[in-house]
């Protein structure tokens, strides 16, 4: 908590994990960031579960497609053997694929990354576009709803409505995609 960025040493990593656990959490989602291998080492040793998330490109273009695929491959090659990592997240809230709802090429890119992660590591779950506008290859239907009103939970009682209509702030699945679960 002292640096907000790269921990200065292993003790800082252990302290961060200990603080997370003391707050009652057993896992973290590392948002848009590949952690240093030492973080995963200590998460393994201390029993902290981790969602490994790829960083997103700012724009969707050929360079982003190539870089995303390479980063996914390198991340898995480097860190697949860490038992603390339980889920891979190739995209978050349509960052870098801002038109994934209706753009077929962005949907195919998200599918490609998800399939690549599944092929390289069939032992872990993949949350294709965590939060909204997911493609059907996702293993998790993650919904990010930032509303604070308690009654907003009522909207989630009807599963068909959740997966087929607009939730806050976006659709749960991209056009032409649906829950396979």
State the predicted function of each range:
Residues 17, 27-181:
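Substrate-binding/catalytic cleft of secreted carbohydrate-active enzymes
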């Amino acid at each position: 908590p002292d640096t907000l960025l790269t921990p200065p040493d292993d003790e800082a990593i252990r302290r961060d994990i200990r603080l997370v656990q003391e707050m009652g959490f057993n896992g973290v989602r590392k948002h848009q960031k590949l952690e240093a291998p030492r973080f995963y080492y200590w998460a393994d040793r201390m029993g902290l579960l981790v969602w490994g998330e790829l960083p997103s490109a700012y724009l969707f273009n050929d360079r982003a497609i190539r870089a995303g695929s390479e980063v996914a491959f390198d991340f898995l090659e480097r860190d697949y053997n860490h038992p603390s990592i339980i889920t891979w997240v190739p995209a978050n809230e349509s960052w870098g694929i801002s038109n994934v709802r209706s753009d077929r090429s962005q949907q195919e890119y998200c599918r490609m990354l998800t399939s690549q992660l599944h092929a390289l590591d069939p032992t872990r779950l993949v949350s294709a576009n965590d939060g909204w506008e997911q493609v059907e290859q996702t293993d998790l239907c993650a919904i990010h709803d930032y509303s604070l009103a308690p009654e907003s939970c009522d909207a989630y009682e009807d599963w068909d409505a959740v997966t087929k209509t607009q939730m806050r702030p976006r659709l749960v699945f991209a056009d032409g995609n649906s829950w396979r679960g």
